[in-house]
Regions:
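Noncatalytic alpha-helical scaffold of FAD-dependent oxidoreductases
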Residues: 1-171
Length: 171
């Protein structure tokens, strides 16, 4: 037997940030420019996700200090192999972020504990929601992929579907 692995190299240098925006529409509108900037990671968190994240013990101030209404956030990362590449990618991201309608201060960090806390927010959402569900109910977990242009209407349709069927705290 034979196998061929097409692996992706892991860049040794990473900076991570959480870009909090007033609405899901603002977050999805920012995506094309962020993708074009060459970000390694862009993870979307909707308002429900942010509310759940506020219950996590190590949630950053950008989330805990927020009075969540229709907000959304983007967990973003720049990866690089040299300090110069990382500085260039971070500068591009910060310039883009400066032009967006941010709902909280934006900062990038290379510090491992701060980066881990940001990722704990993202990765801790499903367990937090599942744990809080009433006895006898099930938490659903399904990743979907849609073209960026369809992301906002897809998210809005899912929110409406969950509301219509009384499925609360869907992330």
């Amino acid at each position: 037997a034979e196998a061929v692995f097409r692996t992706v190299p892991v860049a040794p240098l990473v900076t991570t940030g959480l870009l909090v925006l007033p609405t899901l529409a603002d977050a999805t509108a920012a995506l094309p420019a962020l993708v074009d900037a060459g970000l390694a990671t862009i993870e979307l968190l909707d308002a429900t996700s942010l509310r759940v994240a506020q219950t996590l013990s190590d949630a950053p101030a950008a989330i805990t200090d927020l009075t969540v209404d229709r907000h959304a956030a983007l967990l973003v990362e720049v990866h690089a192999t040299t300090d110069a590449e990382l500085a260039d990618g971070a500068a591009r991201l910060e310039a883009l972020a400066a032009g967006l309608p941010r709902a909280a201060p934006f900062a990038l960090t290379r510090e491992l504990a701060a980066r881990a806390a940001l990722w704990h927010v993202r990765k801790g959402l499903y367990p937090a929601v599942a744990e809080a569900r009433p006895s006898g109910t099930t938490a659903l977990l399904e990743d979907i992929a849609v073209p960026v242009a369809n992301l906002l209407p897809t998210c809005e349709a899912l929110e409406a579907l969950f509301a219509r069927h009384g499925y609360e705290s869907a992330v």
